[in-house]
From Swiss-Prot:
Keyword flag NAD: no
Quaternary structure and partners: The glycine cleavage system is composed of four proteins: P, T, L and H. In this organism, the P 'protein' is a heterodimer of two subunits.
Keyword Transferase: no
Organism (species): Anaeromyxobacter dehalogenans (strain 2CP-C)
GO terms, biological process: glycine decarboxylation via glycine cleavage system; nucleoside metabolic process
Enzyme Commission designation: 1.4.4.2
One Pfam match: GDC-P
Protein name: Probable glycine dehydrogenase (decarboxylating) subunit 1
Keywords: Oxidoreductase
Superkingdom of the organism of origin: Bacteria
Protein family (similarity comment): Belongs to the GcvP family. N-terminal subunit subfamily.
Amino acid sequence: MRYHPHTPDDVRAMLDVVGAERVDDLFRSIPQALRLDRPLDLPPAADEIALFSELRRLAARNETAHPPFVGAGCYPHHVPPVVDQLLLRGEFFTAYTPYQPEISQGTLQALFEWQTFVCLLTGMDVSNASMYDGATATAEAALMAGRITGRDKVVVSAALHPEYRKVLATYLRSTGDEIVTVPFGADGRTDLAALQQAVDGRTACVILGYPNFLGVVDALPEAAAIARKAGALTVSATAEAVSLGLLQAPGALGADVAVGTFQSFGNPMSFGGPAPGFFATREKHVRQMPGRVAGATVDKQGRRGFVLTLSTREQHIRREKATSNICTNSGLCALASTVHLSLLGKRGLAELARLNHGRARMLRDAMERAGCRPVFSGPFFNEQVFDVGDAEAVVAKLAKRGIVAGAPLARWFPDAPSAKGALLCAATELHGPELIQLFAGAVRS
């Protein structure tokens, strides 16, 4: 049942029926002494984030856990309730591909807007209608680079998300392409001298995290220049997409392909997924791009409509000619990101990104006061690595206090600087000053 508020005419008609002059007359039987003759003593209005923070404070009287300080590719962010409410609409509530445009205009238009958002944030010309996740998008970018250049070597930064690198290795195992991994330096950025040495005439692409797995904003322009000189493409992979509200777009820094995940927009952590992957590139590469594109067109009556176009996947064309076998993908998750980004707007996204960076700086200051130095000196967004002495022990200890600490870096990089004590920690808009101080104090104790 839909809710329609009463108009003044509706109220007047109802009062006339019961013989009352005004609404207050309906409460005449209540003694005056029992009526409230002053405004309610309520606190000032609060935005959703502050309201949820207060509700969490009240709920903390029970056995509960704080927003996790672990990121590592999947981040805790506030998801406005309206996102889930819109997803529940019958027109949208399916992850299935809108093959029949005549009955799927709403979904197709939403995917079209998703592509617009992806292009705006990445500085690219074209985007597809989403991928499974950031890892498969990265692997598909390497395959596309091989098709475009005709080369069989992929150079990857060791600071790229380890799980992205594993999926990439799985994809390229069957193609026979060589993967060369380049180390990172003391600042947490890709070692450019090693990159220069690794890139040659066989290199199809160079892949960097932006920001990378260590939370560091990598040297994307310099890496792109090295790749371009050798005739290779540059792929930027972004796991924390909120960073694109503050950092310069990958396309503006020389990247030829921008991939990653929009989990940070409209999608909860959900123990690691699902979350929509994005894929964007230059217009000249559009016919080599995997997946599907939602396009705008006009029908024979001249009316604007939306359709799937450039669907060069194995269900649509001959398998050996297909650019991808990506199927139903993460359409519903992409819709959630689209709704969230629509609510934020350009200014809201910039404010959210600045807030995330501010909280990360606050965490850095608190951890340094607690005696935990940052391991890497490179620029960061909302994630950093700290030396806490014994990362695994700290994680176990804080878990008993209801605090989900960061990710021990030694699980992926046993030979990294300060590996035993290295703890990868993220701070977002959900981590207020009190929680950050609580975390730093718990680590120190």
